[in-house]
Regions:
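Membrane-embedded alpha-helical bundles that constitute the cytochrome b-like, heme-associated redox core
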Residues: 2-205
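TPR/TPR-like (Sel1-like) alpha-helical repeat modules
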Residues: 810-816, 863, 880, 884-915
Length: 955
């Protein structure tokens, strides 16, 4: 019987081979490849334009670029799903392959690919609405920079890893890749080259052809043509991302600069009416519109004499976001709207009414904001020169039909020449650090969640610059019924000035014995005697004169009340029953006249002629005011003097004017009732105050006074400065004040000697002034400002005939670069008053060189004088002294054509002193209170019969 043969063991089943990329997956792969190829070409174009912008410092991104960027986002989103599906299936198909190297490289490629997708999604800033969506948006610039470069680097690493990964598979067909790169390079390169011919030209003046549309305003458009109103009135578009900035702007004086401001409306209507009756058109009023009414002006509607200044769509726009942020060039610092503005380049669909297209536009802006930022925020916007375009004016012949040039308001030049800017070498005080632009004060940082908010160096939270532009226009805020805006302006005004009851003089005369400084010692007043109260107002934190701007209608005055035992015994600055301030008060304003001696009291610029007086206080300076007080003989109780510096935006005369000119159909004016007298209830803000109680001889009552918070040396210095700035009337008293200051044992400071030198120089006592300067230079703790010492030394040396030394002094001011100047941000090379003085000195040196053998030296000095005067004109093209100097220098050089040119310009900018005297005489007869205030020496009586408030009894 045979044995059974065992059957063979079954062979193990071989695993079914799964290709890495099967037929159906290959279709998906090619779809991914096509999307990646298109994205690659698109990315090459985007990267090229970005690099071109970065390398040149110009913006080459435009509407087409943003359309391509939208395509980049769309293609990227479209790629996500097929790419992830392909990677998932491909990973499953190859996870068991034996080629571990290929698998590891594949995993690395997977990580790099995911990095591309995730970084792209993080950069998108997709906003779906709501706080949760906003929280997902990455705003931190440092984090975004890291993500951006990851998004750039990851695709490059993908290419390298893909090549390594493919070494395990079929050979790469390089000819296809080469062809793709060639076509992509040619097309993208050509498109990038076309960007190099971008028609937008920033930082240059618009064509002169635009004058026919805009003159006598100096504003220009970049094309010379009008700009559509739609482009200038797109504020709601800005609101989407800049809510806090928009809110500030909405309540600002900039927003209500135009026909939406009832005060301006009445004034500009008068200007247009006068121009139309005189010229047959309203083109003279363009002078106003370049700054106040940019939307109707730049869009072409303003020139219509029948322009509906209430209901026209552009009439209520004011200075819009685009009106400022689309300015591409400051043509000069002449003011009068001397800027160039463009129709800004927007992202695709910016003006679309379709909600989806608007959403796409918003995402493009947020994902790629560089073009938006460069278009709407340029370096010029951060400069004081930008503000000069509208905060400096002159009155041209086309407006007044009198003279080609009259200076109007001017914030810019006093700021430039102040110590605050770090450019003025002749100031009484200097800040620890210069403030290099207007926004340093008027656009303070404000915490914000706006999309454009960022963490500034000196901020604890993301912030923006305050677009309320806090300043002082409480009147307009009151008319618009905005108490929050009033409060913001009043908060801004705190600690900007101070008032100091500094001393009293016996006999009520400036020559009387001075008791000062009051506090801690208080002199005892004698019943029946007359005293002079010495009051000082000091500007503290401002870079321009107080008040500047609309100085003819700003109402700022000293309100003085003297009481004893509950009764008022002295008064100045009271308000009568009609809400008018006593005209015999001391006003810090400009009393402006027309040619017939009438006060400019309606904001009527076409009639401005000359000021009767100018009581403004320069930055870092002071004004001294004298009050005569007759102490009643029957007084038995202490005397309390309270001085308040009061501010009201408009006086009663002006509020009566603009309310009486309201027409049917106008927007309502707060407090105005047609047919009834208007009550001027505009807010009165107390800017600063001081109170002193004096003991009275014969009274046993004791008095207490709070301690003065600022040092004695400053009080003496401010008092002396105020006297010095009055001109020649009180130079002796100023010298006495500075002499006392120079003699103080504690602290020992240079101010007394230095400012005494100023007084002695003005008096012509040059040797004594030189000695005082030498004494000021000896102080070391703190040292006297070497630039001011050098300037005054140059002035004195020049007048003493030591021209070589004077030139060295003045060049030291302008050219030295010291450690202290650098640390504090000072650059006195822009002080054009010193530059002009250098030009005069060089010219005088040249005149001393008479020998024919030294002709070369003479001509060299004359050429240097020309250079100095030309530098002045770069900074102030309307400088009358520089034009006169050039006229004389060119005459000596034999250049009669240029001498005649500058003679003509000198005549244009020179004041008409003869005509001014006629207006003065007429004004003095019409306005006795103003005539008194215009005298070189003014003493305001506190016991004037009939003064408002005299009979008021304090409770």
């Amino acid at each position: 019987m045979s044995e059974a043969v065992p059957s063979a063991a079954p062979r193990p089943l071989r695993p079914v081979y799964i290709p890495a990329v099967g037929p159906r997956l290959r279709i998906l792969m090619w779809a991914v490849f096509v999307l990646v190829a298109i994205l690659g070409a698109n990315s090459a174009y985007l990267a090229g334009v970005t690099f071109l912008s970065w390398s040149s410092g110009r913006t080459y991104e435009n509407w087409f670029y943003m359309l391509m960027f939208a395509g980049h986002l769309a293609l990227g989103l479209l790629l996500v799903v097929p790419f992830v599906v392909f990677l998932g299936i491909h990973l499953l198909n190859t996870r068991l392959r034996k080629n571990k190297r290929a698998i590891r490289v594949g995993y690395a490629l997977l990580v790099a690919s995911i990095a591309v997708l995730i970084s792209g999604l993080l950069l998108m800033r997709v906003d779906l609405g709501g706080e949760a969506s906003s929280a997902l948006v990455i705003k931190n610039q440092s984090a975004r920079a890291v993500i951006y470069w990851a998004h750039i680097a990851a695709p490059l690493s993908c290419l390298w890893l893909y090549w390594l990964h493919r070494l395990a598979g079929p050979k790469i067909k390089w000819r296809y890749g080469g062809g793709y790169l060639l076509v992509t390079g040619v097309v993208a390169g050509g498109m990038i080259l076309l960007h190099n011919h971008d028609p937008r030209h920033w930082n240059q003046a618009g064509p002169k052809e635009g004058e026919k549309y805009f003159f006598p305003s100096l504003a220009r458009t970049s094309t010379g043509n009008f700009i559509p109103a739609q482009a200038l009135m797109n504020d709601d578009y800005c609101l989407k991302c800049h809510q806090d900035a928009y809110k500030g702007w909405f309540h600002s004086s900039h927003h209500f600069s135009s026909f939406n401001n009832p005060a301006y409306l009445a004034s500009v209507r008068e200007t247009r009416d006068v121009a139309y009756k005189r010229d047959g058109n309203v083109q003279a009023s363009r002078w106003c519109a370049g700054c106040h009414d940019p939307v109707p002006f730049l869009s072409g509607a303003f020139d219509d004499p029948k322009f509906d200044d209430v209901n026209h769509p552009t009439a209520q726009a004011g200075i819009t976001c685009t009106s400022c942020h689309s300015i591409v060039h400051v043509n000069s610092t002449r003011g009068n709207g001397d800027y160039t503005i463009e129709n800004p380049e927007h992202y695709p669909f910016a003006y679309s009414d379709n909600a989806m297209l608007q959403w796409i536009n918003n995402q493009l802006v947020k994902a790629k904001p560089a073009m938006h930022k460069r278009t709407f925020l340029k370096d010029l916007h951060k400069s004081a020169e930008f503000c000069s375009t509208c905060h400096k004016v002159h009155l041209p012949f086309e407006l007044n039909h009198y003279k080609e040039f009259l200076r109007g308001q001017n914030h810019y030049d006093p700021y430039l020449l102040s110590g605050v800017s770090g450019h003025g070498a002749r100031s009484f005080y200097y800040p620890e650090k210069a403030v290099h632009n207007c926004s340093g004060c008027h656009m303070p940082l404000k915490e914000s969640t706006d999309f454009g908010a960022k963490l500034f160096a000196d901020a604890k939270q993301p912030s923006i610059h305050n677009h309320l532009f806090p300043s002082a226009n409480t009147g307009l805020a009151w008319l618009k019924n905005s108490p929050e805006t009033i409060a913001a302006h009043e908060e801004f005004l705190k600690a900007k000035l101070r008032v100091d009851i500094f001393g009293v003089k016996e006999g009520g005369e400036i020559t009387g014995k001075l008791h000062a400084p009051i506090r801690p010692e208080i002199p005892t007043l004698k019943p029946g005697e007359t005293y002079l109260l010495e009051t000082v107002v000091r500007t503290l934190k401002m870079g321009h004169p107080f008040t500047q701007g609309t100085v003819d209608s700003n109402e700022v005055w000293l309100d003085v009340t003297v009481t004893s035992g509950g009764r008022v015994i002295g008064r100045s600055g009271g308000i009568d029953d009609q809400r008018s301030v006593d005209p015999w008060s001391h006003f810090i304003n400009v009393f402006m006249l027309d040619k017939d001696g009438n006060r400019i009291d309606r904001r009527n610029p076409q009639d401005i002629f000359t000021p009767l007086y100018n009581n403004q206080i320069p930055p870092g300076a002071a004004g001294t005011v004298h009050y005569s007080l007759e102490v009643p003989a029957d007084i038995t109780e202490p005397v309390t003097v309270e001085v308040k510096l009061q501010y009201r935006k408009f006086d009663k005369i002006f509020t009566d004017f603009f309310t009486s000119k309201a027409r049917p159909g106008d927007l309502p004016i707060r407090g105005h009732k047609p047919g009834e007298p208007y009550v001027n209830d505009l807010p009165i803000t107390t800017l600063c105050s001081d109170t002193v109680t004096f003991p009275v001889e014969g009274s046993t009552l004791t008095v207490e006074n709070p301690q003065v918070e600022f040092p004695v040396w400053q009080r003496w210095n401010d008092y002396g400065i105020g006297l010095f700035l009055k001109g020649k009337a009180e130079l002796r008293q100023a010298a006495e004040a500075f002499t006392v200051l120079d003699g103080l044992k504690e602290p020992r400071r240079y101010d007394g000697a230095l400012n005494l030198a100023r007084v002695l120089h003005r008096e012509g006592r040059l040797d004594e002034a030189t000695a005082a300067l030498a004494r000021a230079s000896e102080y070391t703790d703190p040292p006297a400002p070497e630039w001011t010492i050098a300037w005054l030394s140059g002035v004195i040396n020049r007048e003493q005939g030591r021209l070589d030394e004077a030139e060295k002094n003045l060049r030291k001011v302008l050219e030295d670069k010291t450690e202290e100047r650098t640390k504090r941000g000072f650059d006195f090379s822009l002080d054009y008053e010193v530059i002009e003085l250098l030009g005069q000195t060089l010219f005088e040196r040249a005149k001393q060189v008479r020998s024919p053998a030294d002709r070369e030296l003479r001509n060299s000095l004359l050429r240097q004088a020309v250079d100095a005067y030309e530098k002045v004109l770069v900074l102030d093209s309307e400088n009358v002294g520089a034009h006169y100097g050039l006229q004389l220098v060119y005459q000596d050089l034999g250049d009669t054509a240029k001498a005649a040119e500058h003679a003509k310009l000198h005549a244009r900018y020179k004041q008409d002193d003869n005509a001014r005297d006629v207006a003065f005489e007429k004004a003095r007869r019409k306005y006795p209170a103003a005539a008194r205030a215009s005298e070189p020496l003014v003493i305001y009586p506190l016991n004037r019969p009939g003064a408002p408030g005299q009979q008021v009894v304090k409770q």
